[in-house]
Amino acid sequence: MQPIELAELLTSQAAVLTSLVVIGLILCFIGYKIFRVYSAVIGLFIGQLVGIYITINYYENALIVILASAIVGALLFALIDELGLIVTGAAFGYFVGVYLLPEYQVYAFVLAALFALINLFIEKPLTVLITSVIGASAIALAVHMGITGTHIYDILNDPKKVFDAIFSNAYFDLLWFTLVLTGIITQYVTYKEEREEEE
């Protein structure tokens, strides 16, 4: 299979919708429980971006540099919980700022810094909330894309369309809110049961 064929397969509507739903369900209902894995995936992507930057600007052997930096990023984020907490909080705060005040970009950065800091101190409640919101958003986006036929390239061209899609009408609002609430309750109940079993 050629790289172009593989890229077309991975970005096909069925693959994208399936990925969004599966990742959304995992994050929504067991996001806190698998936080190390989730954090390692974030590190992998950040390491990959660093590797691409190094390759473009300084180095010739692209595959080795990108692979090495992705592995280092994944290991760092898996071993140092604070890195995942900071990045998760910052990303959440940034998108909240973009959604609430799209005209004032500076507030998105302020909220990103604020949520990154807060997530370090109230790790469990905020991480449960954030993973539930991200998971519910992924599922609601997948449902909207499936119904309307919107393709992932349309979303990538203008990320603000994500919010328009998720909150496009009362039904999507209800779906999103129900998933967030169910995700939070499920994660807390699971965590509580595990703590009781340990005692």
Swiss-Prot record:
The keyword Transmembrane applies. The chain crosses the membrane at residues 10-32, 37-59, 63-80, 83-100, 104-121, 126-148, 163-185. It is found in: Cell membrane. It is a multi-pass membrane protein. One of its GO terms (cellular component) is plasma membrane. The keyword Membrane applies. Keywords: Cell membrane, Membrane, Transmembrane, Transmembrane helix. It comes from the Archaea. This is Uncharacterized protein AF_1434.
